[in-house]
Amino acid sequence: MEKRSTPSLQITDRFGAQAAFASLRLPDGTEASVPAEHAAAIYVNEQPAFRVVCTPALLPQLALGRLLTEGWIASADEVEQIAVCAEGAKVQVYLRHPLPTRRAAAQEVAGCCTDNIALGSPVEQQPLRPVPGLALQPEWVERLTAAMHAGLPLYRATRAVHSCFVLQGGEIVFACEDLGRHNALDKAVGCAVLAGLPPAECVLYTSGRVPLDMVRKAIRAGVPVLVSKSMPTVQSAELAAEYGLQLVCGRKIPKV
């Protein structure tokens, strides 16, 4: 796994990973496994940025991925420290430089029914830039599709979450789950960046739809390929073509 060197980024996660699901007794007396919701506020240089509702795991990765894919920062090199409190209610991200922000009236941001809210925005959002090309191998897509078909632990238990895989050099290196497809992608991007993986060598596979906001996230992450079992919209396909992002959509999971 090739990595690139990055300035030291300190992570203090006092919350860690909590139980991702629990058993719920249904009216008929049977039990079902249901996912847990966790609410957290993300701050940048002690200024409010986002409120997220997510699964209670990988909060530093979620915060880093969200800032990258929403255009707050251009790279992880800008981040000096990420700190999560013991309750997991607050995620503090400290940058190596001041970042002028403006307080926004609370507004919903895409989160796949997770009540995600933007609390602020950078004065100058990072622009979209063309992504590099990558020679995608058919067997890579088949490997990702098979992994999605097999399912990750939380999905197998609840059938109620989204997944996002990171593939590099034909191998799946990260697999993340969350209540929403946007959160799952942000966690996957955060994992890859913290591991020092070059974005230009990575492929993302999302279990969710691929509208404009998901394509923007992939472009800002710098990945050259986004795979999904769902089809894109006209607008997202046009944006992907404009910036060189390869979309491989309609990769249906086989029924059993």
Describe the predicted segments one by one.
Residues 2-168, 174-175:
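Intrinsically disordered, low-complexity regions enriched in acidic/Ser/Thr/Pro/Gln residues
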Residues 181-256:
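Feature captures the catalytic cores and cofactor-binding loops of soluble hydro-lyases/lyases
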Residues 160-195:
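Protease-associated
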